[in-house]
Amino acid sequence: MPARLSPYWLWLLLALPAMGMISPFFDENTRALRGVLHGSGEFSARFMIISLMATPLMLSTKGSRFARWLRNNRRYFGVAAFAYAAVHTAAYLIGEASLARILAEATEFDLLTGWLAFALFISLAATSMDFAVRKMGLWWKWLQRWTYGAAVLTLLHWASLHNWNGWVAPAVHFAPLAALTLYRLWWMHLRVRPQATA
């Protein structure tokens, strides 16, 4: 993956899945809007997973060219994850079309985890700009660690839908991230380090 790839081309690639998600918001095709709900949620999870894989990939591949490219561009994937999560949320709100029903369902486990994940997405996206990074200093890194919390909540939200009957798809999606995260923890805390020589 070329390190010089323009961010504008990357943004275009990240936006491509959204092209077919626009028209259902302007017609009364409930089935199409339901498709947007599912598709946007899945792409949000995928882009978040990709952004979180950057650091463990750097370790496991000893800083391969692709891993370095992903690390340098992971913020774009994170912002794209938020954007698709926003589309996902909008599709849900419009599809329900009832504030009373939305509030009644908000405390159910599958939806509560989704709302909490989206709240974290908002705070992470709001502080993703260079100005926020400079202003927050070390606090920015602390806040970014909550991305892992958003990932866990997203996994629980997706897996618990329909009474946990659809847990296989989220498990498959998150398995590579889980494996790489375990490797990262092993590398940081459990690996045998060479003894220092006097």
Protein language model annotation of sequence segments:
Residues M1-A198:
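Membrane-embedded alpha-helical bundles that constitute the cytochrome b-like, heme-associated redox core
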